[in-house]
Amino acid sequence: MSNKNKKSGGAGNGAAQKQTRQQSHDSQDYSSFKIVLFYCMLIVFLPVVTFFLLKGFVLDRFFSLSEVKVNIASAVGAVVSLHIALGLYIYRAYFGATGSKAVKED
């Protein structure tokens, strides 16, 4: 009987360790998901917002350009903002992940 108690007590600790390890992995996954979602939204919406801000508020009001030139300049601004957003994502993916190192598990 004493062997059964020892085995079940050890199994309880193992289950608790597995549960805390699973919670740790879940929180890491959620954190990674939030980061990727943020950069996806930045990559999708920043160029669109940049295009319309440049077109509607900056170029039309302050410069006397033709509509075609305003559209071209706004498109160039949107492409530049897209490249900045992609560069930020690549920088974060390459240099920002130093705190999360892979841990070998059995």
Swiss-Prot record:
The chain crosses the membrane at residues 33-53, 70-90. It holds the Pfam family VMA21. Residues 1-26 are annotated as: Disordered. Residues 54-69 are lumenal. One of its GO terms (cellular component) is endoplasmic reticulum-Golgi intermediate compartment membrane. It is a multi-pass membrane protein. It is found in: Endoplasmic reticulum membrane; Endoplasmic reticulum-Golgi intermediate compartment membrane; Cytoplasmic vesicle, COPII-coated vesicle membrane. InterPro entries: Vma21. Keywords: Cytoplasmic vesicle, Endoplasmic reticulum, Membrane, Transmembrane, Transmembrane helix. GO terms for biological process: vacuolar proton-transporting V-type ATPase complex assembly. Residues 1-32, 91-106 are cytoplasmic. Belongs to the VMA21 family. Required for the assembly of the V0 complex of the vacuolar ATPase (V-ATPase) in the endoplasmic reticulum. This is Vacuolar ATPase assembly integral membrane protein VMA21 homolog. It comes from Drosophila ananassae.
